[in-house]
Amino acid sequence: GAFLNDQTIHCNAIEDISQALVCTGFSYSAGARTIQAQRVSRMIHDIRDIRRFGAASIDLCFVACGRLDAYFEENLFPWDIAAGELIAREAGCLSGDFSGGPVRPAELLVSPPGIFRPLSALITAASSDNE
């Protein structure tokens, strides 16, 4: 299980991505950041809103305890995601790459089960528009 201050935590039971508060991160590379911003601009009309806090570990824990509904980012390091992704899964989240495959630092999506597939499809579609 996952705990916060000795209390069991669970991710939100959200099932509608139009109500999802989604968190992401942006690259330090200006070119990559431009592509990421274009992706987010394509997604913003289909979700409630976007947030950025700047630390994958915190973002993942915020999804785990229900402060956020989803988190996605790319080009992370294993140490950026290892603990937070485990906590999120223990809190009931699903995790994978943007297409729903296995977790990998190159692409990470974490969300409650009810929005994982629709959010994965949205991220994939918004990303393919950049190619």
What are these regions (language model features)?
Residues 2, 84, 91-93:
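Small-residue (primarily alanine) positions within well-ordered alpha-helices
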